[in-house]
Curated annotation (Swiss-Prot):
One of its GO terms (biological process) is axonogenesis. The gene is isl2b. It is found in: Nucleus. Residues 307-340 are annotated as: Disordered. Residues 9-62, 71-125 form the LIM zinc-binding domain. GO terms for molecular function: cis-regulatory region sequence-specific DNA binding; DNA-binding transcription factor activity, RNA polymerase II-specific; metal ion binding. It comes from Oncorhynchus tshawytscha. This is Insulin gene enhancer protein ISL-2B.
Amino acid sequence: KKKSGIAMCVGCGSQIHDQYILRVAPDLEWHAACLKCSECSQYLDETCTCFVRDGKTYCKRDYVRLFGIKCAKCNIGFCSSDLVMRARDNVYHMECFRCSVCSRQLVPGDEFSLRDEELLCRADHGLLLERASAGSPISPGNILSRSFHIADPVSVRQPPHRNHVHKQSEKTTRVRTVLNEKQLHTLRTCYNANPRPDALMKEQLVEMTGLSPRVIRVWFQNKRCKDKKRTIFMKQLQQQHHIDKTNLQGLTGTPMVAGSPIRHDNTVLGNPVEVQTYQPPWKALSEFALQSDLDQPAFRQLVSFSESGSMGNSSGSDVTSLSSQLPDTPNSMVPSPMDT
């Protein structure tokens, strides 16, 4: 905190009277003895990198060790030149990107799964699934085959198979109606809008399709029956999938494909703050006075003149009289306006 231009140390909270003030971006000021790493107590200045986190200052080494990204396998940090592999939010060294069972290194293009933060190649993941599901009544392979059977057309239109032979007199000839694409499209559109059409809608369908009312009635009955069976079957599959997933005890991982290694970016660590050295304006005059043979009374008058800030209010004759008492200054020293 600053009070009327007075520099206050962030570390100890007292006013800074030192020769140097260390300023940490954006507006933090420290004693030179107070600005040090909170972990290793290394003094920090403008010659090293300083990090500030949660009000504490750290050197670069400790900041990377505490807050830097580490390999999910060996728990060691990365260098700026390291190539890394990523799986979800985990980052790995290329040498650490291996199957946790067979230790085979995964290369770009390999399929793998991430289970309990462990990498598994496709072969080992399949073996674990087979072992875990060995005692279950329905294996994952059977579930897949059943789900594939849903897409197959249901053979409702096929004539039923007779196990016994009827007499010739008992046989009845039934005409099988074959619907074309236009008729099917019309019936399906109406079914999606209303699975149970009323008499008026059925009459309109008779005119639009050219089918008999009986055929239309039977088609809607069969369609509702098939949809009901399909809904029940899907519900049973979901329940069985939930049971198998519980029996696997978390062995189901997320299938992934290894990508190409990328260069590790150190910018995730955050931008280091800048430490600047501040030197009061009278310091240069003080050092010059110690190295030169100056008239001490005249020098004290000059210092008090610069500290009082009355240079702008003094007359030109006073400045001339003071400067005449000083020896010739080197050409490298260029006067600049004083800070107030």
